[in-house]
Design a protein with these regions (language model features):
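Active-site-proximal structural scaffolding
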Residues: 231, 271, 373, 453, ...
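A glycine-rich phosphate-binding loop feature that marks nucleotide/adenosyl-phosphate handling sites
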Residues: 163-168, 395-397, 543
Length: 564
């Protein structure tokens, strides 16, 4: 290839191969056809999976990135193909998922002329990407692709978009590729201040009622071991945000549950009673803090984060520790005294007993005839032994799955956290499975979100991707209905769903499928699903008004958490 000029389209393929990419998700079209022609020629080295919608492609790339730890890649044509990626790009941005999106564009001489399928995808995507760039000359391709992958995966990860004009795809040039090792003025790994390490360790060693709240930063930083070492040496109870779940085994004796709007009673209440809050790789999202004016106002706060922009953005930190948490946790642990906070931890146990009596018992062991979401998740646990990757959509089922799913390995909980994108789970699950072929992947989805990307059953069928799909069907947009019940006097405006026959639809895609309505049939059906080596769709008909508690009303203090 040294003495042979190649086209920009072929250069795209070689750039991807140089970055170790062997799988991409996409949907072809006119402005990206030269690249697709090269995919055909290189299909022995680079697998392209045809999604049924570009949103499915980007969510699949996200799921792949989250389960594998690699960069996900999605590709689409110009115009509507590119704009159909935007929701997934925004989702990846707020959840710090490393994806590279490639879009075709009209020829450079047509830019700005409102040509067929022309959109300014650079302008559209600028607010929701970590970086984007429009290529108009083939010679730019190697450098831009190298930068794109470096930016997507370095520091705080995120999405990058490369827009390539059609003429650049045809243009010939001498190809040479060098991986990017750094970019002037871009510092993804801030130097950790030794003073901040000392100050953090001093606060930790003198705290009487400390609480750790960890987020996805622990997982993104591959810092699970360092985090576990810190938790166990310090003896501090640790609670998780929804994206942090699975970094520490669910059964760990210092794992005290979930914080936030539908989190556990104990960690939410005791956030406002601790004397030290140690936030690790989390961003103090409003769903976690409730009213920021009252959030942990009595406590000293240590905030570990790789992104300086998150420090003091929502909650003021007494000791910010900016940098890679894998390194900072190791250094803090070295200076942390080994302790046990048994008296303090007993308060979490006491509050968990209250939550069990008022919420969990009826969720998991209901006296009523109808199935609940909670008992469905517990039944899935029984047959996966906590070893599966659980991919959830958005809504009540998401909160219930996160509350009751059992995890023993990291990178096992995949969901749309910050953006709350309905329709995420089905395509993300097929991506997660392709990124972790040796692991069971179970998608847990509500009947509303399922129908937003239901067409990806076609992708699952065509590739025979052996994901297990559980639809928790309550014939409602459940989370919205719950709010209408609690705050709008049961005025159920546009939330009742008249659903199709989900089993028949799955069978129309030639997928194994069944429906469960009775408790006696639940576990046998889940066992059949998990034992199957093929894709499987299981519809579980649950109570129509099965609400999710605890709950912190929007804008209220975490101390105002409701149990009913």
């Amino acid at each position: 290839m040294k003495n042979k000029k190649i086209s920009g389209a072929e250069a795209v393929v070689h750039s991807l191969l140089n970055e170790g990419v062997d799988l991409i998700w996409g949907y072809p079209g006119g402005a990206i056809m030269p690249v697709y022609d090269e995919f055909y020629k290189f299909q022995d080295k680079l697998q392209h999976i045809l999604a049924r919608h570009e949103q499915g492609a980007i969510h699949a790339a996200q799921g792949y990135a989250r389960s594998s730890g690699k960069v996900g890649v999605a590709i689409a044509t110009s115009g509507p193909g590119a704009t159909n990626l935007v929701t997934g790009i925004a989702d990846a941005q707020i959840d710090s998922t490393p994806v590279v999106c490639i879009t075709g564009q009209v020829a450079s001489h047509l830019l700005g002329s409102d040509a067929f399928q022309e959109t300014d995808i650079i302008g559209i995507s600028m607010p929701v990407t970590k970086w984007n760039y429009q290529i108009t000359k083939a010679s730019e391709i190697p450098e831009i692709f190298a930068k794109a992958f470096y930016i997507a995966k370095s520091g705080r990860p995120g999405p990058v978009l490369i827009d390539i004009t059609k003429d650049a795809q045809f243009e010939l040039f001498d190809f040479k590729y060098s991986k990017c090792k750094g970019i002037r003025s871009y510092n993804p790994l801030p130097t950790i201040s030794e003073d901040s390490i000392d100050n953090a360790a001093n606060l930790i060693n003198n705290a009487k009622k400390p609480l750790i709240v960890w987020g996805q930063g622990v997982i993104l930083g591959n810092a699970e071991k360092e985090f576990k070492d810190f938790v166990e040496k310090s003896g501090i109870p640790a609670a998780w945000t929804i994206l942090g779940l699975s970094a520490l085994p669910t059964s760990h004796n210092l794992n005290v549950g979930m914080v936030g709007m539908h989190g556990n009673y104990g960690p939410n209440i005791l956030t406002n009673k601790c004397d030290l809050l140690i936030a690790i790789g989390m961003r103090f999202d409003d769903r976690v803090t409730g009213d920021p004016k009252t959030y942990a106002s009595q406590a000293k706060i240590i905030h570990l984060d790789i992104d300086p922009a998150e420090i003091n953005k929502n909650i003021i930190a007494d000791v910010p520790v900016i940098g890679d948490c894998k390194d900072s946790l190791k250094r803090i642990t070295n200076k942390t005294e080994k302790k046990s906070h048994s008296k303090w931890i007993s308060k979490f146990d006491d509050l968990m007993k209250i939550e069990f009596d008022k919420v969990i018992k009826s969720d998991l062991n209901p006296l009523k005839d109808g199935l609940t979401m909670g008992e469905s998740i517990i039944a899935i646990n029984e047959f996966t032994n906590g070893d599966a990757i659980i991919v959830t959509d958005v809504g009540q089922h998401q909160m219930v799955a996160c509350r009751y799913a059992n995890f023993v390995k990291s990178k096992s909980n995949i969901t749309s956290g910050g953006l709350g994108t309905m329709g995420f789970a089905l395509p993300a699950a097929m991506g997660a499975k392709m990124g972790a072929l040796n692991r069971e992947v179970v998608a847990v989805i509500g009947d509303g979100g399922y129908q937003m990307t239901i067409q990806e059953l076609g992708t699952i069928f065509q590739l025979q991707i052996p994901v297990k799909i559980v639809i928790l069907n309550n014939d409602f947009l459940g989370m919205v209905r719950q709010w209408q019940q609690l705050f709008f006097d049961k005025r159920y405006a546009s939330t009742e769903m008249v659903n199709p026959d989900f089993v028949a639809i799955a069978k129309g895609y030639y997928l194994d499928s069944e429906r469960v309505k009775d408790r006696k049939d639940l576990k046998p059906a889940i066992e059949r699903m998990i034992k199957s080596k093929k894709p499987y769709v299981l519809e579980i008909c649950v109570e129509k008004e099965n609400n999710v508690f605890p709950m912190i009303p929007t804008g209220a203090s975490v101390s105002d958490i409701r149990l009913n």
